[in-house]
Design a protein with these regions (language model features):
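Gly/Gly-Pro- and Ser/Thr-rich, intrinsically disordered tail segments characteristic of DNA damage-repair
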Residues: 1-214, 220, 337, 341-345
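DNA-contacting surface of Y-family translesion DNA polymerases
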Residues: 7, 180, 188-332, 338-346
Length: 346
């Protein structure tokens, strides 16, 4: 039986919740985050995005792009509560739900509680319920696998609804920029470009052997995605083992002050991801990749969960002291939290 998969992605979720709850913020460029010198944008409204403001951008750069930008502090408890309300709507149609974060999820509606034959009708109903009951906007992608459903949900944002039928998949993928493929970030995209691969059609022309040689196990996925193949199931119980982020630097750095500043930005983004996913762990890992692509990792485990910048940044600095980089310029800095933490309850 051909699967019916929906990907739901809330549009500018944090910012939209703030605009919903505060009429004075509606219609203006809005950023959720901190405006101070070293602050980072956690989310940007569509009014702000018109000026080029994006999440994970430094607040200073965001204000240069949009001087009239308004900042508000995030309310993670509210976002989590709204996310639970969204999932209650999902559960009216299926219990096979794989959350990716507070604001997006996959749904397998092949067999659904309402016995609705068309997945696109379920997607329409979910979007309408979210709009009417929660006064928020969602985009939805519908297809026969996770890869295409996620691509479809991004296609007509905001408030989008896109369906990719099996008969349309090859043509759709052919024109897809390589950066839009799942698992291809800026560094991998740059490598793809160096190999003459810029879109789905060019990726499809590559053999599995060549892609595996260049990209390891990920090459198999790229080979299959370019052919519209994705056999991964929607995992109703998705156990996350870690949360992390990495920054590949525009220029290699070796000056201590520059490294510390970049470490701060990575740590700040890590905190935002921890809050968004709700993940809790007590092991911090620092990853440093040097200009020659050699890399080192250092880890430290605490007796309690690591959730704040005040805890994580000093630990990261301590791990950094164990790595010699003044004579080996750094090209990438990464931080991750792992070892899921469960508090024992008496």
């Amino acid at each position: 039986m051909e699967r019916k998969i929906i990907h739901i992605d809330m549009d500018a979720f944090y910012a939209s919740v703030e605009q919903r709850d505060n009429p004075e913020l509606r219609g203006i460029p809005l950023a959720v985050g901190h405006a101070e010198e070293r602050g980072v944008v956690a989310a940007a409204s569509y009014e702000a995005r018109k000026f080029g403001v994006r999440s994970a951008m430094s607040s200073q750069r965001a204000k240069r792009l949009c001087p009239q930008l308004t900042f508000v502090s995030g309310r993670m408890d509210v976002y989590k509560a709204v996310s639970r309300q969204i999932h209650e709507i999902f559960h009216e149609y299926t219990d096979i739900i794989e959350p990716l974060s507070l604001d997006e999820a996959f749904l397998d509606v092949t067999e659904n509680k309402q016995n609705i034959p068309l997945a696109v009708d379920i997607a329409k109903a979910i979007k309408q319920k979210i709009r009417e009951e929660l006064h928020l906007i969602a985009s939805a992608g519908v297809s026969y696998n996770k890869f295409l459903a996620k691509i479809a949900s991004d296609y007509r944002k905001p408030d989008g609804l896109c369906t990719i039928h099996p008969s349309q998949a090859e043509e759709f993928i052919k024109h897809l920029p390589i950066e839009s493929f799942w698992g291809i970030g800026p560094v991998t995209a740059q490598r793809m470009h160096s190999l003459g691969i810029h879109n789905g059609e060019q990726l499809r022309a590559c053999s599995q052997e060549m892609l595996t040689r260049q990209f390891g196990k990920a090459g198999v996925l790229y080979y299959e995605f370019s052919r519209g193949i994705d056999l991964r199931p929607v995992e109703a119980v998705r156990i996350r083992k870690s949360v992390g982020c990495e920054h590949t630097l525009e220029k290699d750095i070796s000056r201590q002050s520059s490294v510390i500043i970049e470490l701060y930005h990575v740590a700040t983004e890590l905190i935002e991801r921890l809050q968004r996913t709700g993940f809790k762990g007590n092991t911090l890992t620092l990853k440093i990749k040097f200009h020659d692509f050699n890399q080192k990792t250092r880890s430290i485990t605490q007796s309690h969960e690591l959730t704040t910048l005040a805890e994580i940044l000093p630990l990261a600095k301590g791990l950094l002291k164990d790595i010699e980089y003044t004579t080996h310029p750094i090209r990438l800095i990464g931080l991750s939290i792992s070892n899921p933490y469960e508090k024992n309850e008496e």
